Amino acid sequence: MEPLQRKSELDFQSYRKMPLAQQRTQRLKPTSPEELHDLICVGFGPASLAIAIALHDALDPCLNKCAPTSGWQPKVAFLERQKQFAWHSGMLVPGSRMQISFIKDLATLRDPRSSFTFLNYLHQKDRLIHFTNLSTFLPARMEFEDYMRWCANQFSDVVTYGEEVIEVLPGKSSPDSPVVDYFTVLSRNVETGEISSRSARKVVLALGGTAKLPAELPQDPRIMHSSKYCTALPNLLKDNNEPYNIAVLGSGQSAAEIFHDLQKRYPNSRTSLIMRDTAMRPSDDSPFVNEVFNPERTDKFYNLSAAERERSLKADKATNYSVVRLELIEEIYHDMYLQRVKNPDETQWQHRILPSRKITRVEHYGPNKRMRVHVRAVKDGKDSLIGDGKEVLEVDALMVATGYNRNAHEQLLSKVQYLRPATQDRWTPSRDYRVDLDRSKVSAGAGIWLQGSNEQTHGLSDSLLSVLATRGGEMVESIFGEQLESAAVPDTRFRAML
């Protein structure tokens, strides 16, 4: 064996024996806040985490034969408002499972050789064989969140938690520069209130959703969004054996899960599920329909006309919006049936479903200091009455499961709106998620990307986990493609062996 080849094999074996965490920290290194970054990601949820993983893998010589081994190092930072990594912590309902296959993790569909796959997580946790014995593709939601936290922990050197980004400002390398060539990201420490400033040529906004609450609901600490169910409700209703009255508003998966879980969490309570629809409807996750979440469908959707996109979103609505997994519907129906066996009068049931209803008014204080929720029966989504049409519920808490808004980026980008093309009055992402900017005002090396807020242009899967692995790779190519290519090392026998 030639000396070079022997040394290469030894280097390779040495690399393979390194702890996984050590391998990863070599890929992305911390950058001083005072330095100009290549990239700042605002938010460090699953979308940004998928970008971090894809960038790590692009720099890994075991996965990318042309990965730079020395010289260029990306200067990246991730800013996250939460104090630690968390994914829908308020909806980690006991017993809840994922609604997608674990194969749609943060890496597998992009490159199953990645060390960030769900299967490797199980291997590292010494649970792979035990998980296999479950014979399921749908892990517990709690376990999948732990998987993502395990991934996130490998990037602690480049993530700053407890930093809420408040503004993105334009920046010029010199006062005389005719164009903006970087952006300044201002953030506030959530504990101290201290304002920090970082600059980057490229900025990704991956902010996630913000709670959507119906306008007719007043502000009251006893009215809370479903995203706070597991974290805030236990602080409000502290005695699990107390006979509380609790109402849930909504007809989707979150509403159904909360309604079902309340009956176990507070066994002596009375619960009501209020919905405008006539019944809970099952989600359609059949194989052909489920192809709407295939990564390649993003290309097809993006190339549709605006009218065709609208029709497509409407046709695919049953896969994600205001629908419930059939197994849960059947379990809830069984519980309702057992109540019917005991008493045919539904108005006397401990747990009730109120379909074709809407909340018209909420009084803060009624008898026993409970809220008075005024409910009105509707027909076909209109205000026409059914029967007497009115009912008043006295409740200790109202859980609102009415979805999320995904427009938080608009406020953060208000100071750079003038950089949009004159013909556009909104932020318009291209296929690679980079928003259109007036290039007479912004240099080619500077840009802004949006994640999770592009359903109207990129399809139903834009805010979901299904495409994150593939999209993470697309984002790295869009943001760092030229730098990776220019820093690439030509193939050697060592690289060929890998």
Swiss-Prot record:
The keyword NADP applies. Coiled coil: none annotated. InterPro entries: FAD/NAD-bd_sf, Lys/Orn_oxygenase. It catalyses: L-ornithine + NADPH + O2 = N(5)-hydroxy-L-ornithine + NADP(+) + H2O; L-ornithine + NADH + O2 = N(5)-hydroxy-L-ornithine + NAD(+) + H2O. Binds 1 FAD per subunit. Its EC number is 1.14.13.196. GO terms for molecular function: ornithine N5-monooxygenase activity. Pathway: Siderophore biosynthesis. Homotetramer. This is L-ornithine N(5)-monooxygenase. It comes from Emericella nidulans (strain FGSC A4 / ATCC 38163 / CBS 112.46 / NRRL 194 / M139) (Aspergillus nidulans). The gene is sidA.
